[in-house]
């Protein structure tokens, strides 16, 4: 495949760019920077994911939506088509009640848009393989960042098999190294850098519903949810006909399950339809082999330091995984940055990136928190389903005006903060309309009573 290099309008200068983190966002950013003609060094503290069976500590599948698809498409390398060729479309949520009965909530009854379940490892491999085709990208695996002097553009890395560190220098350092970003830890020390983090009291464990006779055990084209008030379970389909199951519960509930008998009793009570699909022996093995993982939300700003350093993806805005937007938001970071670099000099582009992105990043972090409450509890309520039906009806009538919150987040590139603003005016309009009906109803009732008494 031939690689076409593009030029930035902001500057003709070619820079040496160091990207820390070769995950989904880091490898995508490397491709965009390389297409501009920059010399890119991509550093990853893990070994090459293409030589590993699993990506340790990370969910093995993800939900790809419009923002991520746009980032893949704009590269012009055919990556979106390659991803979708093996991805599994999910057209809605399938809700499992405590009796094992199911109901379906379609994401987009109007335009039939859907999410796509993609394998993290497969997508990462695809991006890294694309990086290999660029002569101006060099990948450095087993390089853990230990020091960063962003003012001087100096980096130091540690390798697992060597006592001596590796030193590097770059014109621009880009941190794509996740929620526990080593580069961000260096930026925190600089004046004017604001940072907050919040752990939630919920942990998660990953389980598996295996394939049976090489077929899915549940309908594959849905995100499956078992809402149970203050805890829940979800399942996404995999390409091998299995489902990755995520059990999310408060840590005290995890701690209360001390032995296999209590675990089977718990699943019999709360997830009776899932238990035979997972299998008792496999459930016991998977549940007790690891401790539940913590979840946190991170907000920080600014995302840049002068024209020297920048944070993207989870390094800039880690979020809980319940809106399926972590990867998509990170990829959208890259497309926004790319558009600014096409128009502005580097330092101005980085400043504009922070200015244009921070409110949207904060917004999606908040939405992810909200969606956890929705998925575990609100989806069971009749009020939620009525609102969903009303949103769908209004969306059919006014598709350019009345875009439901979930649709605007998942199926458009509307800024996240505007998605929230839209939802607020929709809520206000519905509430005022509801109050108007009450006032009119009371007026009609009062008039009828008056007419009956005094005619």
Curated annotation (Swiss-Prot):
Entry-linked Pfam families: FAD_binding_3
Predominant location category: mitochondrion
Record SUPFAM superfamilies: FAD/NAD(P)-binding domain
Annotated GO biological process: 'de novo' NAD biosynthetic process from L-tryptophan; anthranilate metabolic process; kynurenine metabolic process; L-tryptophan catabolic process; quinolinate biosynthetic process
Membrane topology, as annotated: Multi-pass membrane protein
Function: Catalyzes the hydroxylation of L-kynurenine (L-Kyn) to form 3-hydroxy-L-kynurenine (L-3OHKyn). Required for synthesis of quinolinic acid.
Name used for this protein in its record: Kynurenine 3-monooxygenase
UniProt source species: Drosophila willistoni (Fruit fly)
Lineage: Eukaryota, Metazoa, Ecdysozoa, Arthropoda, Hexapoda
